[in-house]
């Protein structure tokens, strides 16, 4: 509240100094010109103070502006993680569970714990089940009003009452399905290398405004693990592939059009 009051006061001063600056530039009267010069000097300082007084919850000015723009509108959130698994300059992709004809990175949406539900309910969240995930209402694939965007992202960054270990999807997609042997991949070494987040954009596919966020984790592989992955791809060409960066960008693996998910290029910063 104090930050809001300060921002309002500074905004008023911003307008007034802007007016006096314009008067000073356009007048021949010496005293008005001097007043305009003083106002101009103050003008830049006030701009800086306004930006400093805005509480962006650590999310930057772009998202702050968007949470104002979409204040009363529903925003779809898809908060996920993906594995960058590189073998000999190519990247391991797996056939999707829902989009059966597309290869995509190993990974999926984070889940929230039961303890987080009161917080999410405070923001009026509702699960998004358009992807057929009617039994997975703990997925961080939800709708909230734009005014709660900053609070949500601050909560997510705190890692409180939510999943933060990406191993679950690796296990479900590659080990539980027997595509890779369990024992050599029972313990993984990985690190977060980047984040995909372009802010709120309109999705033609989902027909709504959405924020798609993905943590990208790079898997560090031993020589043995790399050989096991290459063997698995050779055995299961309908389920696994090693795609080049160019194939991921073009969404076209092995000359077949649009058989790679549009999220694959996120692994390389796309």
Model-derived features: positions:
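N-terminal leader/linker segments that precede catalytic domains of diphosphate-processing enzymes
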Residues: 1-270
